[in-house]
Curated annotation (Swiss-Prot):
Gene: kynB
Organism, as annotated: Sphingopyxis alaskensis (strain DSM 13593 / LMG 18877 / RB2256)
DNA repair listed as a keyword: no
Taxonomic path: Bacteria, Pseudomonadati, Pseudomonadota, Alphaproteobacteria, Sphingomonadales
Family: Belongs to the Cyclase 1 superfamily. KynB family.
List of residues binding Zn(2+) 1: H48, H52, D54, E172
Residues the entry annotates as binding Zn(2+) 2: D54, H160, E172
Cofactor list: Zn(2+)
Name under which the protein is recorded: Kynurenine formamidase
Length: 209
């Protein structure tokens, strides 16, 4: 049986969120006890907390919401590339481009160890010309273990705009610590949330036999 890696962050009250956003929360409406046979709960989550997929609506007012995103980019063969040596931003020279050949999905590992316990303002972003080159090579989806493709304080979102121009899709907040670089099958479907600019995903990688 093929090995499966869960590359999703666990969602809980202390999961790091973007500065100024409310925390993830889980609450109970009912608990098993006398007169109640079931546990029933609800949750609140910022759409960009944890492992998530940005919908085009996030960076374009006329972009598709999570409910309207084509699912095909989120399923299929991918290349996982180690770019932990990049500093501040992944640049053209940080990537072994032979690893990208033929890949429609590319995941970038930037962290030595994923910061599960606290928000990291100094995460490694991705240069717009890297996105452009991915697009020219036929890449349909880019994923990263960082919180965003663009720096935290960016107002121009150059990488996101390059994604828009190439009609690519985005996964952010992946946990890639335990997965060796190489080729895998990716499955990371967004929820069908009408009007949402992003969605949580349960992202997995499956070993290709």
């Amino acid at each position: 049986m093929s090995r499966i890696w869960d590359i999703s962050q666990p969602l809980h009250a202390a999961v790091p969120v973007w500065p100024g956003e409310p925390a993830f929360s889980l609450h109970s409406h009912a608990v098993i006890g006398e007169g109640c046979p079931v546990n029933v709960g609800g949750m609140f989550t910022p759409l960009h907390a944890g492992t998530h997929g940005d919908a085009p609506l996030h960076y374009s007012n006329d972009g598709a919401s999570s409910a309207d995103c084509e699912l095909a980019p989120y399923i299929g063969p991918c290349a996982l590339i180690d770019v932990r040596h990049a500093r501040g931003r992944v640049e053209i020279g940080d990537i072994d481009w032979s690893c990208v050949d033929g890949a429609e999905r590319v995941l970038l590992r930037t962290y030595e160890q994923f910061p599960h316990e606290k928000w990291d303002s100094d995460f490694t972003a991705v240069a717009a010309d890297v996105i452009e080159r991915f697009g020219a090579m036929g890449v349909r989806l880019i994923g990263t273990d960082a919180a965003s493709l663009d720096p935290e304080q960016s107002k121009t979102l150059d990488a996101h705009q390059a994604v828009k121009a190439a009609d690519m899709r985005i996964l952010e907040g992946l946990v890639l610590d335990d997965v060796p670089p190489g080729r895998y099958e990716l499955i990371a479907l967004p929820l069908r949330i009408v009007g949402a600019d992003a969605s949580p995903v349960r992202a997995i990688l499956r070993e290709i036999a």
